[in-house]
Amino acid sequence: MRRVGQIIGLQPDQIEAYERLHAAVWPEVLATIHACNIRNYSIFRHGEQLFAYFEYVGDDYEADMAKMAADAKTREWWTWTEPMQAPLETRAPGEWWTKMKEVFHTD
């Protein structure tokens, strides 16, 4: 199992809309998340920053992320969410959400 933490900015004028959208995530998007081996997925907000955490339980992370990106309903969802977000300037090339390094964990 792989734990993933990510961060991204949120446009200040989109906070309420982003929270409304995520209060009713489309069932097809939730099904794709599950089909791509993502579990225990949460997004937290602090001011204009979003922190996402999930656990990946599959065997091929890159293939599952490509599968998610190829899903038509997920891509449609992203047309709503991406304009609300503000990627960090420090993100790696090709990243939208900036991956974070895990520095501590305990069960």
Sequence positions of predicted segments:
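Active-site-flanking beta-strand signature of metal-NTP-handling nucleotidyl enzymes
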Residues: V4-G9
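Generic structural motif
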Residues: Q11-D13, V57-D59, V103
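Charged phosphate-binding loop/patch that engages nucleotide di/tri-phosphates or the phosphate backbone
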Residues: P93-D107
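An amphipathic, aromatic/His-enriched active-site/gating alpha helix that lines ligand/cofactor pockets
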Residues: C36, V57-E95
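Short amphipathic alpha-helical segments
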Residues: Q14-R39
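Short, glycine- and small/hydrophobic-rich beta-strand elements in well-ordered beta-sheets
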Residues: L30-F51, E55-D59
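Intrinsically disordered, low-complexity acidic/polar segments
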Residues: I15, A52, Y61-A63
